Amino acid sequence: MAMIGLVGKPNVGKSTMFNALTEKPAEIGNYPFTTIQPNKGIAYITSPCPCKELGVKCNPRNSKCIDGIRHIPVEVIDVAGLVPGAHEGRGMGNKFLDDLRQADAFILVVDASGKTDAEGNPTENYDPVEDVKFLLNEIDMWIYSILTKNWDKLARRAQQEKNIVKALKDQLSGLNIDEDDIKMAIRDMDESPIKWTEEDLLNLAKKLRKISKPMIIAANKADHPDAEKNIERLKKEFKDYIVIPTSAEIELALKRAEKAGIIKRKENDFEIIDESKVNEQMRRAFDYIKDFLKKYGGTGVQECINKAYFDLLDMIVVYPVEDENKFSDKQGNVLPDAFLVKKGSTARDLAYKVHTELGEKFIYAIDAKKKIRVGADYELKHNDIIKIVSAAK
């Protein structure tokens, strides 16, 4: 399963965002996931469930459908707090780098209010643009330090074997960087690695970071009066990145209020359903929250995790079934499983994802919506419902 890392300096609301993402909605019970380490958790990306489109009542197993929206579990990691010099082991640098290594994409949480300095201490008028710059530099220098270890020896060997991609893949093993990423990063470089300069290697580290560790910027504490101008600065400075105004604190408050039976959430709004539990202070807080939701169209937290999977990691949702007429499995569960697969995945890829033997003995697949047969190379589309026909017993 792909994993998203939450990164940022101390006191920007990163842990609050982690808690907001991993706090289960009231309707989602306990699912039998593997034991999660303290800094790892299960969040839910959301996508329209095909049940409404098909006019059927679904019975999910690996996910949950709430008001026609499928909630699909994904893994997130709260990366150790970041301070300048982390790549040299400063602060919790080594822990930070180990956490970083595991993630496929990042949500960089910055304090859009400008009330915390580079170390996370209280201050006034700090520029969050600097937070993004120093984080990118830390990751670049970390990749660079791994890339250049025993570089002369590696470059000579790669030159002799005429396989720089394999040499780089071996050198960067453990960083979740695949061969395609490496090929893309070096395509404009000299074919002879022994000619690569220090500047070339630093630029290569930057390219590898951009390709293999894509990132969203969460402009957190967006409800603060000083945040708006900083959010605009972030958008202007980092045009190549998705910048999302967020309030993790508001998201967490709403989830907990819903869990307590005080409110019912609907899309990017909510209604109070138990007035007896609401005192005057809470009512003022709810009015404040409503104003924020109206201004930004939501808390931004769900948007961050959705965009991380659907935009950065290019994922789509597909539904494998065994009965193409009832859209069900053998037990009669309708639309039982929602699978996240890479855009460009084929029917055979899905078969392998369901079970290795299904992939090995794949015969053909059926597009259950259109009731047509498709081949092994059929490219899956978002919200496809697919029956796999295989010689597997």
UniProtKB/Swiss-Prot annotation:
<dbReference type="InterPro" id="IPR031167">
    <property type="entry name" value="G_OBG"/>
</dbReference>
<feature type="domain" description="OBG-type G">
    <location>
        <begin position="2"/>
        <end position="266"/>
    </location>
</feature>
<dbReference type="InterPro" id="IPR006073">
    <property type="entry name" value="GTP-bd"/>
</dbReference>
<dbReference type="InterPro" id="IPR012675">
    <property type="entry name" value="Beta-grasp_dom_sf"/>
</dbReference>
<keyword id="KW-0342">GTP-binding</keyword>
<dbReference type="GO" id="GO:0016887">
    <property type="term" value="F:ATP hydrolysis activity"/>
</dbReference>
<keyword id="KW-0547">Nucleotide-binding</keyword>
<comment type="similarity">
    <text>Belongs to the TRAFAC class OBG-HflX-like GTPase superfamily. OBG GTPase family.</text>
</comment>
<dbReference type="InterPro" id="IPR013646">
    <property type="entry name" value="YGR210-like_G4"/>
</dbReference>
<dbReference type="Pfam" id="PF01926">
    <property type="entry name" value="MMR_HSR1"/>
</dbReference>
<dbReference type="InterPro" id="IPR027417">
    <property type="entry name" value="P-loop_NTPase"/>
</dbReference>
<dbReference type="Pfam" id="PF08438">
    <property type="entry name" value="YGR210-like_G4"/>
</dbReference>
<dbReference type="InterPro" id="IPR004095">
    <property type="entry name" value="TGS"/>
</dbReference>
<feature type="binding site">
    <location>
        <begin position="78"/>
        <end position="82"/>
    </location>
    <ligand>
        <name>GTP</name>
    </ligand>
</feature>
<dbReference type="InterPro" id="IPR012676">
    <property type="entry name" value="TGS-like"/>
</dbReference>
<dbReference type="Pfam" id="PF02824">
    <property type="entry name" value="TGS"/>
</dbReference>
<dbReference type="GO" id="GO:0005525">
    <property type="term" value="F:GTP binding"/>
</dbReference>
<dbReference type="GO" id="GO:0005737">
    <property type="term" value="C:cytoplasm"/>
</dbReference>
<feature type="domain" description="TGS">
    <location>
        <begin position="314"/>
        <end position="390"/>
    </location>
</feature>
<feature type="binding site">
    <location>
        <begin position="8"/>
        <end position="15"/>
    </location>
    <ligand>
        <name>GTP</name>
    </ligand>
</feature>
<protein>
    <recommendedName>
        <fullName>Uncharacterized GTP-binding protein MJ1332</fullName>
    </recommendedName>
</protein>
